[in-house]
């Protein structure tokens, strides 16, 4: 006979961003708890609102499964003394298992007998295991936590109720001084405390108190309500997925409504209006059928439709205050002079150990000079790049960005266009922040891409130079994201810029404000981001490519893909093994690897030397790999007919030199001795 278990934790209002991850974590930890305790179940469903986390287990076994375990002990010769009595070693072993020597049996393993005991544990009734759910709740982890009253245990928010039901049976458990039972809380204003009748009646019992416990149902309610408003007014409403997820975690009983604002505010840049609505007020944006922004918004209240007109008026009033600010800053910022703002950046600290934002811009400008040539920018693009690099942070001192920091770069583009700068300069100022997340949008223009790389490289090198290097999960200056951005942009544009050579060039630059250091650490840091870009590529292939001598990001990613592509083919293993053997022996070469044909003693070493001399890796990675694999028969013939480590030192070094020259060329693709062929 199966049962159903419900566990609900009632809390103070949770931050919206915590709700969904905590709900998921609760479900995962409950499943692990049941598995650990040998309790089978049919399904686990989780619930969450801003004021509760809950999980329900259906089809739960009414008792633990019985457990039978075999334990191996000491060898028989150690377990028995010369008189055939059990030694202290054997007695201690069985005592540790809660058994006696009478439970011992001997089993033979590879010709030798060992002590074995079998321990049987009869499963307990589920009622005896349920109290352990308190430990599940205590094990939840959160990005922030607090303690309250006299309680030293830290948790995300103060706990108010604990509901634990096994079908209709309630459990009087204790969690942070809160007694468990069947009482739960309804909606803060529309509902009241209520008794949950059974584990299966949970949603309906709360629904009567204006709480929709299932987040999926709550989300669907919001979407359906928005769709009805769309149909009624003939408009298009942008249902942003992230905003929707945030809103559903702010309400327990959602009611969507449409408000409006004066059309005069539409003269302000759309980005300002959208930011005011989405980021600051959690409103959905409304457009006409052609995509034009309308003076309306959609909000979702935490409650029903009663007195909705008052709610709409209140939301409109709050939004207008935001829009007034935006309109004011838009008007006043146009009076500012870009060159004046750039000069004032001398007084804005980039970081106290590094210098000002203006100094950061100057260094970035120097880096763009190097990158422009390597990226093959035209004369016009180079001119636009130089201008963009000279002013690209100015908008940080505008009133608009001071109020709406999400608009940095975006407002820079707007203001530079108004000031008569070229569209390319304006676009680069917006694009230099890209990507803003791991999968974020990349710059579209070459000028913007180069400026983005230069800005990020100076940031990375500057922080490394003063010892502010990410460790573990700690990355307060988002250097991993910046590095990932550099790698992604280089790959997307296919620029053949060798990162090691570029970093060497940057270290050669001497600035009055900063001298770069920590080159090796920077290179390893960048390689780690390339590693991440390789995704699910097998670890050994990643290591082979990363250990190679070609540090062009696009080439490295292409090489890894090519190796994965051919790794299942018949000639992969023997070809890699041939190259790997060459790599291992080449490490023994001394000094400069020069080959003297006069020292050849057989045709096979001559053939390999000639093949290596004429080898020029070219074309796509798949073609280069074919070129290398085509050498496999020549390499094998060389090894079969040649004693590489000959007694004659000159002959030995000559043969090692052949292998050294081979591996030097092959290493531009990958270090093949890092690939596992077993």
From Swiss-Prot:
Example of a GO cellular component annotation carried by this entry: cytosol
The protein depicted here goes by the name Glycine--tRNA ligase beta subunit
Q: Listed GO molecular functions?
A: arginine-tRNA ligase activity; ATP binding; glycine-tRNA ligase activity
Q: Does the keyword Phosphoprotein apply?
A: no
Regions annotated as coiled coil: none
Q: What family, per the record? A: Belongs to the class-II aminoacyl-tRNA synthetase family.
Q: Where in the cell is it found?
A: Cytoplasm
Quaternary structure note? Tetramer of two alpha and two beta subunits.
Q: Which InterPro entries match?
A: DALR_anticod-bd, Gly-tRNA-synth_bsu, Gly-tRNA-synth_heterodimer
EC category = ligase
Q: List the SUPFAM superfamilies hit by this protein, alphabetically.
A: HD-domain/PDEase-like
Q: Which keywords label this protein? A: Aminoacyl-tRNA synthetase, ATP-binding, Cytoplasm, Ligase, Nucleotide-binding, Protein biosynthesis
- Set out the biological process GO terms recorded for this chain's protein: arginyl-tRNA aminoacylation; glycyl-tRNA aminoacylation
The keyword Transmembrane helix belongs to this UniProt entry's keyword annotation? no
Lineage, broadest ranks? Bacteria, Bacillati, Bacillota, Bacilli, Lactobacillales
> According to its UniProt record, which reaction does this protein catalyse?
tRNA(Gly) + glycine + ATP = glycyl-tRNA(Gly) + AMP + diphosphate
Q: Which Pfam families match?
A: DALR_1, tRNA_synt_2f
**EC identifiers of the protein:** 6.1.1.14
Q: Which PROSITE patterns match?
A: AA_TRNA_LIGASE_II_GLYAB (PS50861)
